Amino acid sequence: MDEYKIKTVEEGLTKIQFPEFDKISSDAPVFYNPHMELNRDISILALQTFQKQEDRNINICDLFGGSGIRGVRYKNEIDGVGHVFINDISETANEYERHNVELNNLKDIEIFQHDASMFLRMHRGEFDVIDIDPFGTPSPFLDSAGYCSRRNSLLCVTATDTSALCGTYKEPCIRKYNAKPYKSEYCHETGIRILAGFVALTLAKYSKSIEVKLSHSTEHYMRLYIEVKKGSKKSDECLKNIGYLSHCKHCLYREENKGLATSTPDICPECGEKLIQAGPLWLGEIQNEEFISKMIVESENKKLNTKEDVLKLLESCRIEAKSPATFYDVHKICKILKISAPKLDLVFGNLEKEGFEAVKTHFNPLGIKTNAPLKKIKEIIKTLSSSN
């Protein structure tokens, strides 16, 4: 440890030290990403909410420990935590993980140096929470996570390969997630749904099902919090939420087609142009209103450096919990209609006056999630634009 210049940071109630580096990279001697503090703060609330829901001590696996910040915070800041298992293939990372455990005077944290998938299989059924936060895609580790996850456990998954999931690079998404993406105005939501669908299909091999408690797309990454259930019947029901999205890039019509082996339409019923499909992906709920509400309440009991941003994000996710898949970008619609964009609040207000539900989305500040048909949305936008 003496060969590096040491940096000290504090997150929540936890202090850690690690080698200072010029830029965030997987080549750093020990990985620490300051931009993921929001992610870790949200995780503290999610795991505490899960622990209280289960009403028992929980054992946690931090699969990619890096500096140890995530695993150490879990033990230091969450009530009802039994053992924390921190794993990293790097010997240098292991040294700093042990150092940071001692720095915070913690017990019941074990440090391991194993291949991630091998580590999970060595400890099958021992974890109540498995947190997969890799540098890049989580895809190679989800099979082992699915095989090893216990009944009524929590699976937390981060993906930083957003260019693949969002459809900027189609082939990597097909290769890693067995799904075709599409780069639309709602591509970040599509990416979340592709990731959730891949998790569901992977766990189904082991007669396990998923319930998405919270998901968000923030900056350079996507994050899922998934409760894992066991049983073949539950798994069969779960797979009914897998399907495809059909999208028209000419008029912005879209529709859901549930079913892994379902037929999908080729022609847009609105304008007659060719439809583009994305999937297979998850068409079930990607936010759980009750769980998120409990997380918001839990924030009152926690010291979080990013609390303001955390609460803003959680409230947005809570509001969109019951809304349909995908959203409409008002400016994109106006561009197609070749009209000026009205104020967003007026669009919301007029949709609600017409008896439709309409909420904002954390995926896009210009997005509207609504159960109104596209024709009605365009009609309202045209009327408002002409009266500007």
UniProtKB/Swiss-Prot annotation:
Q: Which sites bind Zn(2+)? A: C248, C251, C268, C271
Q: Which reaction does it catalyse?
A: guanosine(26) in tRNA + 2 S-adenosyl-L-methionine = N(2)-dimethylguanosine(26) in tRNA + 2 S-adenosyl-L-homocysteine + 2 H(+)
GO annotation terms (biological process): tRNA N2-guanine methylation
Q: Does the keyword RNA-binding apply?
A: yes
Trm1 methyltransferase domain span: 7-381
Q: What class of enzyme is it?
A: transferase
GO MF, one annotated term: tRNA (guanine(26)-N2)-dimethyltransferase activity
Q: For binding S-adenosyl-L-methionine, which residues are annotated in this chain's numbering?
A: R40, R70, D88, D115, A116
Q: Which domain of life is it from?
A: Archaea
* UniProt entry tagged with the keyword tRNA processing: yes
Q: What keywords appear on the UniProt entry? A: Metal-binding, Methyltransferase, RNA-binding, S-adenosyl-L-methionine, Transferase, tRNA processing, tRNA-binding, Zinc
EC numbers, comma separated:
2.1.1.216
Q: What does this protein do?
A: Dimethylates a single guanine residue at position 26 of a number of tRNAs using S-adenosyl-L-methionine as donor of the methyl groups.
Hey, which family's this protein in?
Belongs to the class I-like SAM-binding methyltransferase superfamily. Trm1 family.
Alphabetical list of HAMAP family matching this protein:
tRNA_dimethyltr_TRM1 (MF_00290)
- Provide the protein name: tRNA (guanine(26)-N(2))-dimethyltransferase
What is the protein's species of origin? Methanobrevibacter smithii (strain ATCC 35061 / DSM 861 / OCM 144 / PS)
Q: What is the lineage of its organism?
A: Archaea, Methanobacteriati, Methanobacteriota, Methanomada group, Methanobacteria
Q: Which gene encodes it?
A: trm1
